[in-house]
């Protein structure tokens, strides 16, 4: 629900969005419904669909197609066996396209089958400006989303304990059956180190999508999520967006007990 019209904090992004996670209130947006390439922000959808449809302790066998997937990688080997939960950490911390493909094949039966599940979830969440064709976010026709849709998706996913725990993790180790040492994955999301209260969510880049970022932070019991698409100055813009949200819309102003939201009484 949107209470009044969201204001606009200008950024260097082609599109941006800022949302209160608990209420779903849109606090700021610029070109928020513009359909754009989203690179690895796709993996937010991949993760939540896998969490909801798979079993975290199941063992996934990595296919040759997954192991050979181009782009950012965990360097998984064909035939390697790894738990779904560990793949999810590799997916969200290191943006492994091999992990995304292995997850999709395991949970959806195929990349196409998993994309079907992704689009079902998008429809369920009212993501009217989104379409998913693959689990990694590699540039492909018919694969896009919008800043507002991604804010809605991230807010939904952050209500899931498993998802929330993964995306706030700075460093994760996991068993590596092929070597004498463990996998060690360091989260690419610099906001976790640079911004007070930061607790998620995902970076993204392709040559066509350029720099994309979804971040979240919690202060004084209030969690906000910020989205920028095609933004060369994304780290600074996210600090500005989140600062703006916490300062202009502290928790008590986002929703007051008994207040009507979009025509409906809000029950606390």
Regions found by a protein language model. Name each.
Residues 127-128, 139-144, 148-268:
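Domain-terminus/edge residues, biased toward the C-terminal soluble/receptor-binding domains
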Residues 1-161:
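Active-site-adjacent loops and short helices of periplasmic peptidoglycan-processing enzymes
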């Amino acid at each position: 629900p949107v209470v009044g019209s969201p204001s606009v904090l200008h950024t260097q992004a082609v599109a941006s969005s800022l949302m209160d996670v608990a209420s779903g209130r849109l606090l700021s947006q610029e070109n928020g419904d513009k359909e754009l390439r989203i690179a690895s922000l796709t993996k937010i959808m991949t993760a939540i669909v896998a969490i909801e449809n798979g079993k975290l302790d199941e063992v996934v066998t990595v296919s040759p197609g997954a192991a050979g997937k181009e782009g950012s990688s965990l360097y998984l080997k064909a035939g390697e066996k790894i738990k779904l939960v560990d793949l999810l950490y590799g997916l969200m911390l290191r943006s492994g396209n091999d992990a995304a493909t292995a997850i999709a094949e395991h949970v959806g039966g195929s990349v196409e089958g998993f994309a079907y599940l992704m689009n079902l979830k998008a429809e369920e969440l009212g993501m009217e400006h989104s379409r998913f064709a693959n689990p990694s976010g590699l540039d492909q026709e018919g694969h896009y989303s919008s800043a507002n849709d991604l804010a809605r998706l991230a807010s939904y996913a952050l209500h899931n304990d498993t998802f929330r725990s993964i995306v706030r993790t700075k460093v994760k180790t996991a068993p590596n059956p092929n070597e004498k040492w463990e996998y060690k994955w360091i989260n690419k999301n610099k906001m976790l180190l640079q911004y007070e209260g930061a607790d998620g969510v995902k970076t993204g880049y392709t040559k066509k999508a350029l720099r994309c970022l979804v971040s979240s932070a919690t202060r004084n019991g209030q969690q906000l999520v910020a989205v920028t698409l095609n933004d060369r100055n994304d780290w600074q813009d996210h600090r500005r967006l989140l600062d703006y949200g916490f300062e202009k819309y502290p928790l008590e102003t986002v929703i007051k007990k008994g207040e009507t939201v979009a025509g409906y009484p809000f029950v606390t």
